[in-house]
């Protein structure tokens, strides 16, 4: 069991399972580079959270947006895009917003399409485990909504996925404690990463190291600040 100060972002699990180096660059070194794909993903999350009410009742479904999450067992905290509460005859929990019994059903919004790597499923399963710990009820299913297909992909939180999620959470804490960024390894999935140029810059006439790339990036940012002050 972890303490409050030891909790790490639930969203970091997706990065960790996709690539430990990407996770370390973001959460250890504080490096982030937007590209059209990440910007599209941010817009999708904003639409999921919406500007309307945080919760609304649609028939036998109560929709809650931007829901706070926490698990001391996994050592994670964060927010869920959407948690649907489905009305059930038995085995659910009571909510202040509506009468009856309800079961939580987390929904995470992602740009693109379903991936071969189960990084999105692990993140969603971690959200389910957080909800179980917070609400004291089993969460057996959820869904991933992909912007490219405009469809949901159902996810069952079976023993295998739960074990993968617990291992990923443990590894995330180990990685943060080690304070060491893993070495770069070129893989086909690197082309999908917004940090590709930071992680493994394309060699220029004199060769471009990560250090040189970051130095140039800082100089551009400082130049932008100077122009704003003028």
Predicted segments — roles?
Residues 16, 27, 47, 164, ...:
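Residues that form generic nucleotide/phosphate-binding pockets
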């Amino acid at each position: 069991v972890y303490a409050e100060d030891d909790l790490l972002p639930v969203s970091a699990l997706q990065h960790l399972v996709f690539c430990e180096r990407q996770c370390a660059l973001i959460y250890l070194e504080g490096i982030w580079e937007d590209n059209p794909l990440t910007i599209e993903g941010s817009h999708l999350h904003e639409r999921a959270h919406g500007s309307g009410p945080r919760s609304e009742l649609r028939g036998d479904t109560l929709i809650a947006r931007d829901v706070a999450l926490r698990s001391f067992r996994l050592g994670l905290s964060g927010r869920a895009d959407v948690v649907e509460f489905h009305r059930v005859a038995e085995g659910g929990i009571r909510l202040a917003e509506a009468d009856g019994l309800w079961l939580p059903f987390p929904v995470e919004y992602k740009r693109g399409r379903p991936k071969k790597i189960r990084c999105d499923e692990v993140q969603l399963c971690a959200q389910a485990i957080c909800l179980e710990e917070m609400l004291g009820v089993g969460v057996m299913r959820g869904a991933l909504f992909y912007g490219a297909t405009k469809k949901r992909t159902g996810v069952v939180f079976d023993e295998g996925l739960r074990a993968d999620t617990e291992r990923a959470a443990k590894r995330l804490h180990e990685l943060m404690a080690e304070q060491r960024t893993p070495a770069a390894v070129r893989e086909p999935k690197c082309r999908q990463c917004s940090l590709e140029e930071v992680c493994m810059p394309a060699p220029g006439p004199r060769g471009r190291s990560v250090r040189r790339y970051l130095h140039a990036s800082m100089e551009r940012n400082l130049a932008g600040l100077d122009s704003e002050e003028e």
